[in-house]
């Protein structure tokens, strides 16, 4: 009995076009040959008037930029096919390091004094105060276990879901992504309590009770593992 040939390329039609699942165990040259054969069989060159979007998934295979371009060129040569995306489950070491820096919690114990700027790529956990004139900046969230009386900028790289939380919230300015808020009104003596700031549905920064944070941003509970 003849052994059934392993299928290295699987084509699935979707409402958005077609998805190509490419095997991650065979050689790249074998993959290209079978991909060309499959596309030639299932999709003819046609007149090129109706473009079909192609989503390519390569599993646990790392593709260089040159290899990605080879796949794009092969598919593009079918005239009515255009590559929308090529997705791999594998990332480079540089990408992994960048992801870690952007998502980790950086604990720092200090007082940020006037004129000083503290900047981290990920989430900042500051154990200490931010004095008037001091600035803290984070690519993610900012948590201040102390008094925030200076400037805080969370979501520095464009994350509008970032939040700012402090034991005592009395800042000169709050900024989340590209949205800014001037200092809120002075609180009455003894009225200071832990608060959080976030961007609401109207794209305005709102300062509210810290207890609301888990409801507003439920994914923040995943960060607990980085703290404890």
Curated annotation (Swiss-Prot):
Pfam families: MinC_C, MinC_N_1
Key words, A-Z: Cell cycle, Cell division, Septation
Domain of life: Bacteria
Gene3D superfamilies per the UniProt record, alphabetical: 2.160.20.70, 3.30.160.540
Gene Ontology biological-process entries: cell morphogenesis; division septum assembly; regulation of cell septum assembly
Keyword Phosphoprotein in annotation: no
InterPro entries recorded: CAP/MinC_C, MinC, MinC_C_sf, MinC_N_1, Septum_form_inhib_MinC_C
Keyword RNA-binding: no
Cross-referenced PANTHER family: SEPTUM SITE-DETERMINING PROTEIN MINC
Family: Belongs to the MinC family.
Subunit-level organization: Interacts with MinD and FtsZ.
Function: Cell division inhibitor that blocks the formation of polar Z ring septums. Rapidly oscillates between the poles of the cell to destabilize FtsZ filaments that have formed before they mature into polar Z rings. Prevents FtsZ polymerization.
Annotated NCBIfam families: minC (TIGR01222)
Protein name listed in UniProt: Probable septum site-determining protein MinC
Annotated source species: Bacillus cereus (strain G9842)
Encoding gene (name): minC
């Amino acid at each position: 009995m003849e052994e059934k040939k392993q299928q290295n390329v699987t084509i699935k039609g979707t409402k958005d076009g077609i998805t190509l699942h490419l095997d991650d165990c065979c050689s790249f040259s074998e993959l290209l040959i079978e991909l060309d054969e499959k596309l030639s069989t299932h999709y003819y060159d046609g007149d090129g008037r109706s473009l079909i979007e192609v989503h390519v998934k390569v599993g646990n295979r790392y593709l260089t930029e040159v290899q990605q371009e080879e796949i794009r060129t092969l598919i593009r040569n079918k005239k009515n096919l255009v590559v929308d995306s090529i997705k791999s489950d594998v990332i480079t070491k540089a990408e992994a390091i960048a992801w870690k820096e952007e998502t980790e919690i950086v604990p720092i114990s200090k007082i940020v004094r006037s004129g000083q700027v503290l900047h981290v790529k990920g989430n900042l956990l500051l154990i200490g105060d931010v004095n008037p004139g001091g600035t803290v900046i984070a690519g993610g969230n900012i948590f201040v276990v102390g008094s925030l009386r200076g400037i805080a900028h969370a979501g520095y790289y464009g994350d509008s879901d970032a939040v700012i939380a402090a034991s005592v919230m009395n800042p000169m300015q709050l900024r989340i992504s590209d949205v800014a808020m001037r200092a809120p009104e002075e609180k009455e003596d003894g009225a200071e309590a832990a608060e959080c700031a976030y961007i609401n549905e109207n794209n305005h920064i709102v300062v509210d009770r810290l207890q609301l944070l888990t409801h507003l941003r439920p994914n923040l509970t995943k960060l607990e593992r980085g703290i404890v």
